[in-house]
Amino acid sequence: MWAVVDHVGVQVISSSRSEWIAPFTGLEPGQFRTLVRVVAQRGGEAIADGRPGRQWRLTLPDRVLLVAVYWRTNLTMRQIGPLFGVSHSAAHRVVDSLGPLLALAPVRKRRVDQVAIVDGTLVPTRDHRIAARSKNHRYSTNLQVAIDADTRLVIATGDPQPGNRNDCTVYRDSGIAEQLVGRPVMADGGYQGNPEVIMPYRTPRDGRDLPEWKDDLNTVHRTVRARVEHALARMKNWKILRDYRRAGHTLATTASGIAFLHNLTITG
């Protein structure tokens, strides 16, 4: 595999070389082209560099690639910039300007029988203004994610909350409950206090075994619920969700963008 080399001798990853796409983004070339097309439709070409009289050095596909590579690898801006032949400050501007355009589109239409599955995951987050020490003994945020039980596509992400808060309260405070209004929602037993959520039957306090029919339903519930756990694991293949170094207020759009990339890997 050979890199494209610019006139100053700096190695550059380019979207014109399809062999760079999958290893550095997790997307196949066709999926990446879909991503670029969506960003263009959302106004990506019209976004200015931010410096008076200056044009972007990178084409829109290369800027989209930079964002996807950054999220996938979690390299620092000082590492990402030279890979694309730009300064680290230019890499910052690309991520800040295009990242929000990759966000997951809201679900506008839904069948009333479409079941959602929701779960939370801890995202190690260095911005202590939004993070808190959690059960993993790191400063983290609690990110709520919901998928469609049938398609396994991510349909909603919540606003990250401090990692020491329980799922039962974060479900409401993050806004994801509001996004899922009107459809059945499944979750584990940590979502007590949300009567609209379908949870497994609890073992009686007197120690008796559950009736067989309840035990069977719990088995089915657990099997279906595993789908959201698999989705969260796939989302964390974008390594930025394993150690979030950016300002905390950007995590919501980053997580939503990664949800969109995750969906592209399923739908193409």
What role is predicted for each listed range?
Residues 1-52, 58:
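Charged, often Cys/His-bearing segments associated with DNA-binding zinc-finger transcription factors
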Residues 28, 59, 209-213:
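Ser/Thr-centered flexible coil motifs
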Residues 33, 64, 252-255:
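Non-catalytic, well-ordered alpha-helical scaffold segments
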Residues 48-49, 62, 213-215:
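Glycine/charged-rich beta-loop-alpha catalytic/anionic-binding loops adjacent to active sites
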Residues 53-54, 142:
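Short, charged beta->alpha transition segments
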Residues 59-73:
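Short, amphipathic alpha-helical "recognition" segments used to contact nucleic acids or chromatin
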Residues 79-268:
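Short, well-ordered secondary-structure "scaffold" segments embedded in the functional core
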